[in-house]
Amino acid sequence: MLLLELKKTNQTLETIHFIGIGGVGMSGIAEILHNLGYKVQGSDLSENYNTKRLEAYGIKIFVGHTPQNITNVSYVVVSSAINRNNPEVKEALERKIPIIRRAEMLAELMRLKCSVAVSGSHGKTTTTSLVACLFEAAGLHPTVINGGIINNRSTNAYLGSSNYLIAEADESDATFISIPSTIAIITNIDPEHLDYYKDFDTLINAFRSFITNLPFYGFAVCCIDHKIVRELVNNITERKVITYGIDSDDAHITAFNISTDITSSTFDVKISLPNVSGVTIIEKITIPTPGRHNILNSLAAISVGVELDFGIKAIKNGFNSFKGVKRRFTKVAEYNQASVIDDYAHHPEEIKATLSTAKNIANKQHGKVIAIFQPHRYSRMQHLFDDFMRCFDDADLLYITDVYAAGESPIEGISGQSLIDNIIKLKYHNQANFLAKLDDSLEVIMNKASPGDMIIMMGAGNISNFANELPQKFGNLS
């Protein structure tokens, strides 16, 4: 980055090319580099919200991957999803163009900043957004690189004016260990990305390194409601750790007097920090998003704000300004007085949290929960097949589509149909159905939706596109 800075100063800018620039992680870094004045371009297999947004900023976007796309580039940036068989990667190797991993480029952006890195199996994107809102309310105006679209800004990344940078740290391939952060947040740790880590212990050890790699003056923020995180924290003595939770009375920061509805959550906070006498209570914090898991995400942000002495007013103002994150329990349509929710949940624990929130709301409205789930990646489904069978308890009606491959090859015996077959066979759900086509969801909604129902469309694939097209589809029916 220092070399790039020197070249920028000398007006000898060279082009940085992003392969897979439409991904949430890649697009954010590309946008920040562009805003810093670097020459950026990229390619992706198809257009999406991110590519169109970047193109509107003046960033050149190629649809499709071909060697010709990198004719005049000096650096190529790739994520872990891009393999060496990619034609642009092959061309870069042939021409000896430096290939930089996404996490390395993120690390370079963070190196010269005071950085907050948010990691964990679930909740990273919302937590990153909440932390950013608190920094803004405290007048610190950070640079932010997130894994989802922040509704306040309609982007997943923006350049701030201060020396602070807040970033979502992806744990999928252990590169998050090398991110030079001052503050590290761990929301939870579940068996995920085992195709890379091979076993759960290796993943846990990576999170340990994430904390111990902090500078001595930094600190970690960890949710000890989660058993694995608690065990991890109990064995760390070389770094300062602030803990939070709802069910953990021994946590430094806890929530109580909790109430939720379809649009928000309200709660009080108790603060009891180590080596600080007395207890502080913050009353009636409200966030415009429902769910216990989002209260936990808020507690992570509060922990950072308290430790950095933002003050109660800034913390409350920060939450008041928060407008949520795209695809996190987002209402996209209504049909027959039933709400259609678009949600990114694609891991069993995320599904349970989302459906629990939906069930709580549906019960208050005398409705039912209709879950429509699109599995994401054959490898994830294979590793967590048993957990997927057990995670739909809060759905009154369950519909599962086939797997969104995300570039993976099929695995024998792993499919949406096989998941449904096993759920029925082992009696985990008595109202489970397979949808041969995602388009069949429209008929399900039309035939099953009743007033007060919560229709939850979940997954990390293209189910979101379908969900967001529903208002138009409903309009065409009239």
UniProtKB/Swiss-Prot annotation:
Tagged with keyword Transferase: no
Entry GO terms, CC: cytoplasm
Alphabetized UniProt keyword annotations: ATP-binding, Cell cycle, Cell division, Cell shape, Cell wall biogenesis/degradation, Cytoplasm, Ligase, Nucleotide-binding, Peptidoglycan synthesis
GO biological process: cell division; cell wall organization; peptidoglycan biosynthetic process; regulation of cell shape
Annotated binding of ATP, by residue: G120, S121, H122, G123, K124, T125, T126
Keyword Cell cycle: yes
InterPro entries: Mur-like_cat_sf (IPR036565), Mur_ligase_C (IPR004101), Mur_ligase_C_dom_sf (IPR036615), Mur_ligase_cen (IPR013221), Mur_ligase_N (IPR000713), MurCDEF_pg_biosynth (IPR050061), UDP-N-AcMur_Ala_ligase_MurC (IPR005758)
Pfam families: Mur_ligase, Mur_ligase_C, Mur_ligase_M
Signal peptide (from-to): none
Record PANTHER family: UDP-N-ACETYLMURAMATE--L-ALANINE LIGASE (PTHR43445:SF3), UDP-N-ACETYLMURAMATE--L-ALANINE LIGASE-RELATED (PTHR43445)
Family stated for the protein in its record: Belongs to the MurCDEF family.
Protein name (Swiss-Prot/TrEMBL): UDP-N-acetylmuramate--L-alanine ligase
